[in-house]
Structure formats: C-alpha cells, structure tokens
Amino acid sequence: MSAASLKVTTTSRPGSRLAVEVAVPAERSQASYEEAITRLSRSVNLPGFRKGKVPRTVLVQQLGALRIRATALESLVESVWRDALAQETIEALGQPELSGSFEELLDTFKPGEALTVTMETDVAPSPTLKSTKGLKAEAETVAFDAAKVDEMLEQSRRQLATVVPVEGRKAEQGDIAVVGFKGTYSDDGSEIEGGSADSMDVDLEHGRMIPGFVEGVVGMAVGDSKTVDCTFPEDYPKEDARGRKASFAIELKDLKTRELPELDDAFAKQASEQETLAELRSDLEQRLKDDAERRSRSNRHDALLAALVEQLEVELPESLIQQEVRNLVEQTAGQFAQQGMDVQSLFTPELVRNLMESSRPEAEERLRRSLALTALAESEKLSVDDADLNAKLKEVKGQLSGERDIDPERLRQAVLDDLLQEKLLGWLEENSTVTEKAPEAESDAAKASKPAAAKKDASKAKTAKTSKAKTAKAESESAES
C-alpha cells in the first residue's frame, strides 16, 4: 500500500508538538495481519512442523489470536507512521507517542477493517522575532589594567624560582612548608576522610588550604607541633564537611622558600620568546589590552543576544531541551575526565539526575540564543559567502595539519557556524545601541580567585599567541555564543 493512499490530518499542539492522525484503509490492516502470520510462521518452532509450514489454524491456536493481532498492529503503526512522515514531509524529532495506550488501540484493531491511528511527536520549532533593529542593551566595558603586567611578571618569577631550604627562622607567608598532619572533626572527634598526610608540601598562601590552616603554620619552626582549629567553608566540595569545625594536629618537618630570579633581560629570555624585559613588558601589555577588548566585545555580544532573545517567540520542544541537557552533562563529564577523574565511579545515577535537573535552565537559554540567531539570519537574509567559508576552512586546515581524527564535515559545519555567528553579531552591533554600564561590585570569591587567574595568564608568557586551530578543533561540534 503506497503512502499516497493514506489520509493524514495534522494538528499543532503546544510545546512544538504535532498530532498526526492517519486513516488506515481496511486492505492495509488486512495486509499487515497476513504479513504478521507469515513472519511468525517462519520464526516459531512447533514440533512436527518445519518453519514457514505451520498451518494458520495451528499457529493461531498455539500463539493466540491476541499475540498475532498485537504483532500485526505494532508493524502497522510503524509502517503508517513512516509513510505519513514521508507523505507530509514532516521532520519529527525523536520517537512518536500514541495518543492513548497501545492496549486501547489493540482493542479497536480488527484485521480487514479501517483503523484510525493518532500519534504525537516533537517537531522543529519555528522561531520568530518581534523586532530585529533598534535593540537597546547595556554592557560592561573591560578596561586595561596596567598593574596586571607586574602581577603577571611576579607570577612568572615564582614559576621560575629556585626552591632552597630555610634555616634559622620560622615559617613565613609565601614559604613552602613540609608538614605532616591529621584532621578530626571537632563535633564528634571522627577522622576527616582525606584529612591526613605523613608529608605534604603546602604553599603558605591564603586560599591554599581551608581557612585557618596556613595561618596556623605561619610562625612555626621546623620540628614544632601544634593543633590548629579550622572551619570548613559552606561551599566546600564535600557536602558532609561544609560548615563543620575541625582540628588539625600539625608537625612542621621542613621549610623551604623560593629564590626569585632578577627582573632583567635574562629573565625575559627565560620566561618568554622576547629578548629584553622591555619587550616582554610590551608584549604582556598588548596581550592584556587585546584581552580587555575581547572581553568587552564578548560583553557587548552577550548583552545584544540577551536583548534579541527578549524579542524571540518560540515554543521549545521537550526532546530538544533533553538533548541539550545531555550535551551539557556530557561536557561536564568530559571536563572531569580531562582532569584525571574517574567519571564512571563519580557519575552515579543520582548525580546524573541532579546534573540534568540543574542544567535545564542553561540548556533552555542556550537553545533560545541559538534559535534567536537562526531567526535573525532568516529574517535579515544573512548568510556566509562560499569564498569566505573556503578561505577560513583553508586557514583552519593549515593549522590542523598535524591533527588526526578530524571529521571534515563537522569541521566545515563548525567553521560555518562560527562565521555566521560572527556575521550575525556584527550585524546586531551595527543595528542596535549598546551603552556602557558600571562594573558590578567584585565578590569575595572573585577576589580570592585573582591570584590563580594571574598565574594562569602568566603561564602564557612563554607561549606564542593561542592557535585558532585548537579553538576550531575544540568547537568542532557547534558554535557557542
């Protein structure tokens, strides 16, 4: 029976869903039943009969009429759904769902009689924008901070420092203490899991250990022992330790410090590809200025995209949301794996459920941003020229010449997505108004993270400008705004 003979009626449902009602003619329901009997006859093993030679009456008696009808109906539903999609050119997302139960449909199914099958499926959303031009947004401008040049130089000096033993004085801030310690909870005296070590190097810097630990070691002499009272922060990774008071019995076994290299041309050559300290300073300054501009541009784009999303009208299908949630969870798992963590043991079913639940708002926001840009491209007829795409592809492939396991089609799509997004965001900047807003007050957590961030920036001093090829490889699945 050809798909053209089916009568198909579609009805839109909320949440970007579509109800598809298919009128199945009597001859097709009969054909499905006959095919089911033939299939079962070929697969069933009955004593005294060869496969495919079981008489119909015996087959029905042995298997039961209900099982044969159910087998026929399953096949019929699958085939009419496939034909209806092709006939109506419906782009379904995921698997369809019967309107009602299979058992209810089975009760109405009589081979040789017409049947109506109604199914629902998610379909691709149809995003529209109420407005595209004249949008208004506020964005923070990131200013170049000259003091960060000195911070980066200091961090680089620390990385290139020579560690030497300390003699004749007590531990000071910035030293490296070799300590043995044993931690117990103050409330019940139980040992802290992972809270003991026979010998461990500890940088005596604020934020390296839980509050109170480093401060307790400062002032100790080699060979000293003392008990230090600490309190685990409320955001400590181990939930059962959060906010609990603890005592650490500490022994200072050895003490070392760093001898920093002189800040001169020799240091510049060792720390970077520059020949002089002046050149290194100039290079770091330019990097910081470029970074400030990139961050400012990113802030403008984020603000404009948020303004565009406010103009978006769309219903997100649940299947798309769930797929994006899974993508986010997989990204999290990948990040943990790169850090050497055992993802299989860490990602328990409960943790995965919690991650999926907490990731849903971000997943929905990412979908809205993506669909808003899609709608903008369609509304303003913006696209990427083949010449621009091919030129960028040639550039990226040249940078990836030594890389393996790169899917050419995925790479092409990633480059196309990046170029289109760049074009769309540029168009938004030209056709919208972005005003500068005052920087938000810096939180204590952000302040505490500054040394680590400065260290990360300083580590780049010895490396040439980050390769765009690596970015293209890392983003080979999709362009992220």
Swiss-Prot record:
Keyword 4Fe-4S in record: no
Written domain comment of the UniProt record: Consists of 3 domains; the N-terminus binds the ribosome, the middle domain has PPIase activity, while the C-terminus has intrinsic chaperone activity on its own.
Primary gene name: tig
Biased composition (Basic residues): 462-471
Catalytic activity: [protein]-peptidylproline (omega=180) = [protein]-peptidylproline (omega=0)
Function: Involved in protein export. Acts as a chaperone by maintaining the newly synthesized protein in an open conformation. Functions as a peptidyl-prolyl cis-trans isomerase.
TM regions (residue ranges): none
Location within or outside the cell: Cytoplasm
Region (Disordered): 430-481
Protein's name according to its UniProt entry: Trigger factor
Pfam name, any one: Trigger_C
InterPro entries, per the entry: PPIase_dom_sf (IPR046357), PPIase_FKBP_dom (IPR001179), Trig_fac (IPR005215), Trigger_fac_C (IPR008880), Trigger_fac_C_sf (IPR037041), Trigger_fac_ribosome-bd_bac (IPR008881), Trigger_fac_ribosome-bd_sf (IPR036611), Trigger_fact/SurA_dom_sf (IPR027304)
SUPFAM superfamilies: FKBP-like, Triger factor/SurA peptide-binding domain-like, Trigger factor ribosome-binding domain
GO molecular function, one term: peptidyl-prolyl cis-trans isomerase activity
Domain annotation PPIase FKBP-type: ranges: 174-261
One cellular-component annotation, GO: cytoplasm
